[in-house]
Regions:
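Active-site nucleophile-adjacent alpha helix/oxyanion-hole segment immediately C-terminal to the catalytic cysteine
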Residues: 1-47
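Conserved active-site-adjacent core of cysteine acyl-enzyme catalytic domains
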Residues: 41-99, 105-114
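Generic beta-strand structural signal
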Residues: 104-105, 137
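Noncatalytic regulatory segments and standalone regulatory/sensor domains
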Residues: 111-131
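Short aromatic-glycine-(Arg/Gly/Cys) micro-motifs in beta-strand/loop hairpins
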Residues: 133-152
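A short, exposed loop/beta-hairpin motif centered on an aromatic-Gly-Thr core
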Residues: 149-162
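Short, mixed-charge low-complexity intrinsically disordered segments
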Residues: 172-183
Length: 183
């Protein structure tokens, strides 16, 4: 199963499969992924953040993706995107194909083109970044306690009407509201 997905902020079709796959599978912002890959290329020594090998190194060592290899077996068809989706219908995966990275979430490949017939050599199971918020009230003023897996932020204080709009924006961006406060 394939669904069109283009995370590029300007909607451009460019060679950004590494950023697309990571941003979708890990539930990260596209530009945040670009910044992270730029920082990480100092570790790998790659010239470009969009290098396929650099991307898989980042997935394995920074996102702690669990590596699954699919070697060729004589007399049997190779694993491809379509067979992978059927074999692994649940979870977030980054698929390493010949010169390409793609994303599979719950049995659906998300990419700018249908690569489901390409051989999958390696897949990485990743846990998506979880983003939460909690609205706090202090007399007539509200603030949002916003967190992801790495950092915690406190938004500016605002009145109830603005906070309701802000909370809706957070929900639209994929944040989940929590009952308890995270520390």
């Amino acid at each position: 199963m394939y669904t069109y997905y283009n995370a590029h902020p300007k909607g451009l079709l460019v060679g950004d499969c590494v950023k697309r796959a990571i941003s979708k599978a890990a539930n990260m912002d596209y530009m945040e992924v670009q910044r992270e890959l730029n920082r990480h290329k100092k570790v790998t020594g790659c010239a470009n953040y969009y290098d396929h090998n650099h991307g898989t190194h980042y997935v394995e060592h920074v996102l702690h993706g669990v590596k699954m290899s699919f070697p060729a077996v004589k007399g049997k068809p190779r694993m491809n995107g379509e067979r992978f989706c059927k074999a692994y219908p649940k979870g977030h995966y980054i698929l390493s194909m010949a010169g390409h990275l793609s994303c599979c979430i719950d049995g659906v490949i998300y990419d700018t083109w249908d690569c489901s017939d390409k051989c999958v050599y390696t897949a990485y199971k990743v846990e998506p970044e979880t983003k939460y918020f909690k609205i706090l009230k202090d007399r007539d003023t509200y603030c949002a306690h916003v967190t992801n897996d790495k950092e915690t932020y406190i938004s500016a204080y605002m009145d109830k009407k603005r906070m309701e709009a802000y909370a809706q924006c957070l929900k639209d961006l994929g944040f989940k509201e929590r009952e308890e406060l995270l520390t």
